[in-house]
Regions:
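C-terminal motif of bacterial Sec signal peptides marking the signal peptidase cleavage site
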Residues: 8-10
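Sec-dependent signal peptide recognition
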Residues: 1-4
């Protein structure tokens, strides 16, 4: 197996450091680095960040290489990945996970999860655009996996028939003509009878002329080899993220304009309760991410969840909100980027810091930045 050399990709912005002791390897400080900007690697644009920390401590990112413009599918888009083995200070050259070959033959909107056996599962979509999709000319759902910490990837497998359309095992999903995944992080359950289950939030488009989206959870109990679909988790939804709570319930956080949407499942994501809105988190209709920082049932002194999302009714000022009550309320947003900024993804590093992969848009086109945050910079109480 060929190991790719690690390289530092420069466009790091200067960050003031405290003029104290000389650097110590284990000291966690804030730092940031631009990983993709317009024109890099021959691509006009880059979008749609996802990041995860792997069992060996390495970091894996994936994103869209939007070769000719910034538009979504059905444009010609590749999905690429990079790795870091030094907590995000240097990164490998990009590896192509799914290669687009022309309009209606591209791929995009990837999400990641690490399975119990260490495999990395990546789901994404390809083909037609979401709202133009039909069973005869669809946007398709794909899965591929890496068994070597993201260095190589399997050939993408089309799993659309398991999820929606006339062949779907969930008969409700036969009433839908398209589906896509909320890019960023999926979820692996670690508590209760469904421990080991992996899942992603999907937004499905109803048949007919309606562009209304509903959220379902796509889950697997065999590390992503076969898939099932939950009951409807959120009506009138969009891109969404999932989190396991300390009492074993699953929380879904749903993109909305204004107060962000949510719901809960008490049976491992299969059925869902009554949807609601978080008045404590009002934001632009945008994708974000949710991350567990601490859990009392694992020995921590309190429960802490983080949620990244624009702290604005516009796509700007992406921030991290904090919850100390398992997502009932959100507070104390910490600004990640002061200015136009859009999608974001988070992960917890082995050294205890928080890694963020973020779309910053200071000059009219997205740059994809990695930020490393000490936990004490994010928690204010």
């Amino acid at each position: 197996m060929l190991l790719l050399p690690l390289v530092a990709w420069g466009c790091t912005k200067p960050v003031p450091e405290s003029p104290v002791d000389p650097p110590v390897v284990d000291t966690i400080k804030y730092y940031e680095q631009c990983l993709f900007r317009p024109g890099d690697y021959g691509s006009t644009n880059w979008r749609i960040p996802a990041i995860c920390c792997l069992p060996d401590g390495s970091l894996l990112i994936v994103c869209d290489r939007r070769k000719y413009n910034e538009s979504d599918l059905p444009e010609d888009i590749d999905i690429v990945s990079r790795r870091s083995t030094d907590n995000g200070r240097t990164w490998s050259e990009p590896v192509t996970i799914a290669q687009g070959t022309g309009r209606k033959h591209g791929f995009g909107d990837a999400a990641l999860v690490v399975c119990e056996n260490g495999d990395v599962v990546c789901v994404f979509v390809g083909g037609n655009g979401l709202f133009a999709s039909s069973e005869s000319d669809p946007i398709s759902s794909y899965v591929c996996r890496s068994t070597d910490s993201g260095q190589t990837w399997s050939t993408p497998e089309n799993i659309s028939a398991q999820l929606w359309g006339s062949q779907a095992t969930n008969t409700v999903c036969r009433n839908y003509r398209a589906s896509f995944f909320g890019s960023g992080n999926g979820l692996r359950l670690t508590r209760g009878e469904h421990a080991g289950r992996i899942m992603f939030a999907a937004a499905m488009c109803r048949k007919g002329n309606s562009n209304t989206l509903d959220n379902f959870v796509v889950f697997s109990d065999d590390n992503g080899h076969t898939w099932q679909v939950s009951d409807r988790a959120y009506s009138g939804g969009d891109e969404a993220k999932l989190m396991e709570l300390t009492d074993g319930r699953v929380l879904i956080s749903v993109r909305q304009s204004g107060a962000r949407g949510y719901n809960h499942s008490a049976d491992g994501g299969k059925t869902w309760g009554t949807q609601g809105r978080w008045e404590s988190m009002k934001t632009n209709a945008c994708n974000g991410d949710i991350l567990r920082l601490a859990a009392t049932d694992r020995g921590d002194s309190r429960d802490i969840l983080l949620h990244s999302i624009p702290n604005s009714m516009e796509r700007r000022n992406v921030s991290i909100f904090v919850s100390y009550d398992e997502g009932d309320t959100w507070q104390d947003p910490v600004l990640l980027f002061d200015g136009p900024s859009v999608y974001s993804s988070m992960t917890l590093l082995k050294n205890g810091s928080v890694g963020v992969f973020l779309e910053e848009n200071p000059n009219g086109a997205c740059e994809l930045w990695y930020q490393n945050w000490p936990v004490d910079s994010l928690i204010r109480q």
